[in-house]
UniProtKB/Swiss-Prot annotation:
Gene3D superfamilies reported for this sequence: 2.40.10.310
UniProt KW Magnesium keyword: no
Superkingdom, taxonomy of origin: Archaea
Compositionally skewed regions (Basic residues) per UniProt: 13-23
Organism classification: Archaea, Thermoproteota, Thermoprotei, Desulfurococcales, Pyrodictiaceae
Keywords attached to this entry: Ribonucleoprotein, Ribosomal protein
Name of the featured protein: Small ribosomal subunit protein eS8
Assembly and oligomerization: Part of the 30S ribosomal subunit.
Region (Disordered): 1-23
Species: Hyperthermus butylicus (strain DSM 5456 / JCM 9403 / PLM1-5)
InterPro entries: Ribosomal_eS8, Ribosomal_protein_eS8_arc, Ribosomal_Se8/biogenesis_NSA2
Amino acid sequence: MGVYHGNDLKKPTGGKKRPHQKVKRKYWMGRYPTFTRLDNRDVRVHIRVRGGNYKIRLKRAAYANVIDPETNTARKVRILRVVETPANPHYARANIIVKGTIIETELGKAVVTSRPGQDGVINAVLIEKRSERPAG
């Protein structure tokens, strides 16, 4: 379902504006946000957007491409949990992954650099390596 992103007839003060004489244009329409959630498998959806292009939306995520800045190598690793989301504290509680989210992976903590709802993939940069516990 589309979401109207045009101007409504309310002023910031709460008063009403005069009704505009234009009809609603198709290019004023939008969509609801994707809210990529942590899951045990990846789920991607291909949607057609304006101009006949396609976007890949990541609905559910289990893996991330994590780059280690020390060795400059990338690995596909499992996401263990969502630690913190600076964009919205409620997102971390609901396991929603957006750009800037700090995630716990098999390698350690990483910050998400891609937009999963737009790109269809989670790319992240390692910020804190996981400490190896000695056996015994």
